[in-house]
Amino acid sequence: KRTGGYTYQATIPATEIKDDCFRYNIIVCRGNSTRTYPTGNSGYRNSSSGIKGNPLDWNYTSGAYWTTRVVAPDSAIPLLTITDADSRIEAYTLPEWNDLQRTLVDSSPVEKPLLRFRFTPKGENPHYFLRTFVKNLIEERKERVKDCSVLCIRVNRTKALPEGFSAGFVTSDGYTYKSPCPAPSSEGIIRIPLKDLRQTDTALLPVAYPTFLKQYFHPETEIAFLPERIEKLELSMSGNKKELVEIELGNIWLE
């Protein structure tokens, strides 16, 4: 049914949900015209206008579907999944740019991959930041996030954490809340209780140019952390002008 504007809502019977993924097509009827979406990689021209008819009319099958993940209401909220050297995570350095090497570490047949970040300093007292946008993931699980109490970060359990390694969030109103990371468990999992997050300066990233512009926002008012306002996940660490800084990062989630 239509809920407003171009937004429509449907209730899917539980019996139609198989495994952890729901696949579906959308059939649009207007007058005597019926079009099916998506078209996938079919050879049709003007594929944005859909495929004529509905699947019951065709003498062939189409493997093109939209998909939606299906999870249990009390399951963890994944914030970062390492899949390749990009993995939707951005890297920055303040006060200036530094060299960065990103390498996917995926040599084990039984463990999930890690993403190695290796920063080479070019100036004095650098600070390194890793950020990824997670607002959409939070909004998809609004009810669940209210009950989450721990931020979990998987790292290489055989390597020491970088100096000043901290983790937390930037909210939609521009405030940053972080906590120093404790030592990981024997499984390589860092667990940070959300109640330990503290308001701190917000790094103004990407790096401003010219470089004499402000690089941090210093809050003057103490504002409580609200998980439902999370916009970005942020990790940060300190460096110096002589030593490489390296972190091998795995999946990150809320539970």
Question: Model-derived features: where do they sit?
Answer:
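Glycan-association/targeting regions that enable binding to alpha-glucans and other polysaccharides
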Residues: 1-107
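Beta-rich carbohydrate-recognition modules and glycan-binding surfaces
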Residues: 64-255
